[in-house]
Amino acid sequence: MSLVRLNISRGVTGTLPTSNYVQGSGDLVRVGGASATGQNVGHLAIDSLFSSTYRNYLVVGYINLLSDSSQIWLRYRKNSGTTVEGSGYKFAFHGTNVSDSVSNISSSGGDSKFRLSGGTTSNDGYPSLYFEIKIFNPAISSMITSIHTTFSEFDESAVLTRYSGGGFNTATEAHDGLYFVPNSQNLENYHINVYGMKDS
């Protein structure tokens, strides 16, 4: 059987697209994040993430809690160092666990946060929550800041539930960072990276 030699450079012009999370040389550029183990803290604020350099962002990470049975919440931060609370958060997340049971998390009218989980485990071998969140237009003061997310939680019995959905805050204002907070327990371990998405 004869071999066919391919010339992969023939007919190719320009530069092939690449993506590199670590070096920031592709379509995603790391703009910030946070990582720690063995903590006992009530919240995590990550500031100075969003600017006019990028319109949209990607957040990837995981969180472990110190004790069982706590929800994990997410709020926006302003460049003044204040956390956005109030009742402007609206969201709808649809989930399915490993037994095909359906679970939904939503805000019926308005809420003071995005709720990213039910009651989670504190087992260090199982992330309480791991997630991928796309954030749209956070630095544009004339638009709402919205999210589209996929996240998975392990509950107190290490049962996995995966959610997907979206949400937004009704205020048309610019935001600077993110604020993760459990509703009843403390954070122990976390590793979060935030990337700006290049337009071209």
Model-derived features: positions:
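Surface-exposed molecular-recognition determinants
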Residues: 2-200
